[in-house]
From Swiss-Prot:
Subunit structure: Component of pre-60S ribosomal complexes.
Stretches assigned to the Helicase C-terminal domain: 295-452
Origin species: Ajellomyces capsulatus (strain NAm1 / WU24) (Darling's disease fungus)
GO cellular component: nucleolus
Function: ATP-binding RNA helicase involved in the biogenesis of 60S ribosomal subunits. Binds 90S pre-ribosomal particles and dissociates from pre-60S ribosomal particles after processing of 27SB pre-rRNA. Required for the normal formation of 18S rRNA through the processing of pre-rRNAs at sites A0, A1 and A2, and the normal formation of 25S and 5.8S rRNAs through the processing of pre-rRNAs at sites C1 and C2.
Protein name per UniProt: ATP-dependent rRNA helicase SPB4
Length: 676
C-alpha cells in the first residue's frame, strides 16, 4: 500500500506495528479499543492509520481509498472521539455532527456500525437503552441512571426517506434530542429546515460526506447547497470516496479549509498504481449473449469453495424484475436469488437487503448500481457483471463489493466478442486492470479465489488454466428452458419485453459509446439470450430484416394467458371490446396474426379534458382513502396518543409557517454560490 498526502510533512515508511490501534496519537479511548477488539480488527488499515490522526487533530480531510478499505471506521472514530472530548455536553436540540450518505442502505449501515461502537460506551449505551424502553421519552432526571445528565454521551438518529415521515422524524428529534444525525440529503434538509433543529457555531463540530463524488452528482447538488448554507463555516469536514479524483473540481467548492488530501492505493506486481484491493481478483469473460447465463451457472457451480454470497449486476431495474423469475430455473437448487433495485418500495429494499446479508445458504443478489456504492455486505465472494455499467466509474464500485477488508474475492465482467474487447484496454488506462477468467480444468472445481491460485500475475500452475467452454447445446438448452417458463405466464413475457427495451436504452447511453455501439448488436442472438418469444417493436429495429419471431412458432397469442385470474379476465374483456369495435368499424375482426393486442388509449391519445378529469377523480379517491385511514387510526388511539398527535401537528404547522416566512424574507447574508 502507498499513502500520499498533501500539506503535511513527509514521514518515514510506517512499520507494521505502527498500525496498531493503541499506537495512535492522540491515543484512542479505552472503550473504543475494546469495541474495535470485539469487532475483530487487530490492526488499522492504511486508510485508517492515515486518516484518524489527522481528522482528530482538527484537519479537514479528502480521502480517496480503494473500496473495502475501512473508510467507515476512519470517520466514525474521530467523530465520536471529538464529541466525547468536548468541555460540556451539547445543548438540547443542538446537533454536533452530521454524516451524509447517498443511499438509504449505506446510511443504515453507517448507523448500525455507530451503534456497535456506542454499545461499549457506558453513558451512550445507557441512554440508547432508555430511549428504546421508553419509546423515545427520555427523562434526564431519572435517579435510576448511574450517569448524571452532565455526562458526555452520543445520541444518534437515523433519517431516511420512505421509512418514516418528516413529521415522525421531527417528533423523534424533539423527544430524543440527538447530537449525531446519519441521513440521506433530502430527509436531512427537511429536518434542518425546522427552527427547532440548531447547528450553531458553539455546538456543531463535524460534517462527513461519505461516497462524496456520488453525493455531488445530479440530484444531490441542490440539497447539499441548502444544507451547507445552514451549517457554520467553522467546522471540520471530511469527504470519503473510492474515486475522489474524478470529482475533485466539485469537491473543492464544498467549503473545506486547507484540506489534507489522502490517497491510499494498491501497488501491483509491476509497482503500478491500482485502485482496487490486492485481495480482489478482477477478471473478464468474452462470451456471446446466449452464453451468458450458462456461464453464470458454470462459474457459481464450479468455484471451490462454493460462493456463499454472490452479486449479479444488471443495467436496469426491469432486467432485475425479469431475471428474478428466470434464474431459479437455470441455477442449481442450492442457490437462492434475491432481487434489489431502486424502484422497489423502501420496505421491500430493506427486507431483501437484510435477507441477503443474513442468509445462511448460498445466495445471489440480483441488483443494479443501487448496491454498487459503499455497502459493506459481509463475506461477498463473487461479483458478476452481466451488463457493463453505463458509467465507467461504477465498474470499480461494483467490483469492490467483494474482496473487502482483506477478504479474498473474485469479480467477473461479461463482454461480447468484437468491439467490446476494447473495454479491457479502457479499464487498464483507468488503473483497474482485468485479466481473463479461466478455469483450472474441465473436470475439477476452479480455485480462482483460493489462496493457492489467487494471483493472476503469477499463478502457481499457469499451464493448468484453460478458458471455460460453453457449448452451443448449452446455450440452446438454456433458451428453451427460459421460453418454457415464459409460456406458462404472459406476465413474464411482458416483463421480458419491457426489460429488453430498457436494457437497449441503457446500452445506447453508455458513456464509452465508441465501444458499446447499438449498430454492432446481433438482434436475433440477443433475443434468444433473453428467451424472448419475439422481438419488441422498437425504433432501433426499423431496418431489421431478420426473423422477428426468433424461430418461435405456434404461439396462440389470443389464448396466451396470465396466471393471475383477475389480470387475465381484464385482458379478455379488453380483447373482446377491441374485437367488437373492429367489427363495427371495419366489418372484420383483427386476427391474432397481427401481433399482440394494443393497449387502450393512453393519456397522450385521449382529449385533454378527459385526461384531466380522470386524474382529478383518481386524486379525489386517493384523498378519501387517506382520510378514511386517518379516522380509523384515530379511533384506535388512546387520549394520550391523541394529545401527542395534536402537539406534533401544532409543531409542524409552526415549522411550515416559519419556513415560509424565512423564504419570503430577503437576507443580506453571504450566500453559498453552489456548484458550477
Amino acid at each position: 500500500m502507498a499513502t500520499s498526502a498533501s500539506r503535511i510533512a513527509p514521514t518515514t515508511p510506517q512499520s507494521s506495528h505502527s498500525r496498531a490501534w493503541d499506537a495512535l496519537t492522540p491515543p484512542l479511548s479505552e472503550w473504543i479499543l475494546d469495541a474495535i477488539s470485539a469487532m475483530g480488527f487487530s490492526r488499522m488499515t492504511p486508510v485508517q492509520a492515515s486518516t484518524i490522526p489527522l481528522f482528530m487533530a482538527h484537519k479537514d480531510v479528502v480521502v480517496e481509498a480503494v473500496t473495502g478499505s475501512g473508510k467507515t471506521l476512519a470517520f466514525l472514530i474521530p467523530v465520536v472521539e471529538r464529541l466525547l472530548r468536548l468541555e460540556s455536553p451539547i445543548k438540547k436540540h443542538h446537533i454536533g455532527a452530521i454524516l451524509i450518505s447517498p443511499t438509504r442502505e449505506l446510511a443504515t449501515q453507517i448507523y448500525n456500525v455507530l451503534l456497535s461502537l456506542l454499545a461499549f460506551h457506558g453513558p451512550s449505551a445507557a441512554r440508547l437503552q432508555r430511549t428504546e424502553n421508553n419509546s423515545g421519552e427520555v427523562d434526564e432526571s431519572n435517579p435510576a441512571s448511574s450517569y448524571p445528565p452532565s455526562t458526555l454521551k452520543i445520541v444518534p438518529q437515523l433519517l431516511l426517506g420512505g421509512t418514516t415521515t418528516p413529521t415522525q422524524d421531527l417528533s423523534a428529534f424533539l423527544k430524543q434530542s440527538p447530537n449525531v444525525l446519519v441521513s440521506t440529503p433530502g430527509r436531512l434538509l427537511e429536518l434542518l429546515s425546522s427552527p427547532h433543529a440548531h447547528c450553531s457555531q458553539s455546538s456543531f463540530e463535524v460534517l462527513v460526506l461519505d461516497e462524496a463524488d456520488r453525493l455531488l452528482d445530479l440530484g444531490f447538488k441542490e440539497d447539499l447547497q441548502k444544507i451547507l448554507q445552514r451549517l457554520p463555516k467553522q467546522r471540520r469536514t471530511g469527504l470519503f470516496s473510492a474515486s475522489v479524483s474524478e470529482a475533485v473540481d466539485q469537491i473543492i467548492r464544498v467549503g473545506l479549509r486547507n484540506p489534507v488530501k489522502i490517497a491510499v492505493k494498491v501497488k501491483g506486481a509491476g509497482l503500478e498504481d491500482k485502485r482496487t484491493p490486492a485481495s480482489l481478483q478482477m477478471t473478464y469473460l468474452l462470451t456471446p449473449p446466449t452464453h451468458k447465463l450458462p456461464a453464470v451457472k458454470y462459474i457459481v457451480s464450479t468455484l471451490s469453495p462454493t460462493p456463499q454470497r454472490s452479486i449479479l449486476y444488471f443495467s436496469t431495474c426491469a432486467a432485475v424484475d425479469y431475471y428474478q423469475h428466470i434464474l431459479p430455473c437455470i441455477l442449481p437448487d442450492r442457490f437462492t436469488t434475491i432481487p434489489l433495485h431502486g424502484k422497489h418500495p423502501p420496505q421491500v429494499r430493506q427486507k431483501n437487503f437484510t435477507r441477503f446479508v443474513n442468509s445462511v445458504t448460498s445466495s445471489i443478489l440480483l441488483t443494479t448500481d443501487v448496491a454498487a456504492r459503499g455497502l459493506d455486505i459481509p463475506a461477498v465472494d463473487l461479483v458478476i457483471q452481466i451488463d457493463p455499467p453505463t458509467d465507467p466509474k461504477a465498474f470499480l464500485h461494483r467490483c469492490g463489493r467483494a474482496g473487502r477488508a482483506g477478504r479474498r474475492g473474485l469479480s467477473v465482467i461479461f463482454l461480447h466478442p468484437g468491439r467490446e474487447e476494447d473495454y479491457i484496454a479502457f479499464l487498464n488506462v483507468r488503473k483497474t486492470p482485468v485479466t481473463e477468467f479461466q478455469s483450472t480444468s474441465t473436470s475439477t472445481p476452479s480455485q480462482l479465489y483460493s489462496s493457492s491460485h489467487f494471483s493472476a500475475s503469477s499463478p502457481k500452475n499457469p499451464q493448468t488454466f484453460h478458458p471455460i467452454q460453453i457449448t452451443t447445446a448449452d446455450a440452446t438448452s438454456t433458451t428453451e428452458k427460459i421460453r418454457a417458463l415464459v409460456l406458462r405466464d404472459r406476465a413474464i413475457h411482458d416483463k421480458a419485453q419491457r426489460a429488453f427495451v430498457s436494457w437497449l436504452r441503457s446500452y445506447s447511453k453508455h458513456q464509452a459509446s465508441s465501444i458499446f455501439r447499438v449498430a454492432d448488436l446481433d438482434w436475433e442472438e440477443l433475443g434468444r439470450a433473453w428467451g424472448l418469444l419475439r422481438l419488441p417493436t422498437m425504433p432501433e429495429l426499423k431496418g431489421f430484416t431478420g426473423d422477428r419471431n426468433l424461430g418461435v412458432s405456434g404461439v396462440d397469442w389470443d389464448n396466451y394467458a396470465y396466471k393471475d385470474r383477475q389480470r387475465e379476465k381484464h385482458r379478455r374483456m379488453e380483447m373482446e371490446g377491441r374485437s367488437s369495435s373492429n367489427v363495427n368499424n371495419n366489418g372484420d375482426a383483427t386476427g391474432s396474426d397481427k401481433g399482440p393486442l394494443k393497449r387502450p388509449a393512453t393519456s397522450e391519445s385521449i382529449p385533454w379534458s378527459q385526461n384531466l378529469e380522470r386524474k382529478s377523480e383518481k386524486e379525489r379517491r386517493r384523498e378519501r382513502k387517506k382520510i378514511r385511514r386517518y379516522h380509523e387510526q384515530w379511533k384506535k388511539m388512546t387520549e394520550e396518543e391523541k394529545e401527542r398527535v395534536r402537539e406534533t401537528e401544532q409543531m409542524v404547522n409552526a415549522v411550515r409557517k416559519a419556513v415560509q416566512e424565512q423564504d419570503q424574507t430577503v437576507t443580506r447574508e453571504e450566500e453559498f454560490e453552489g456548484f458550477d
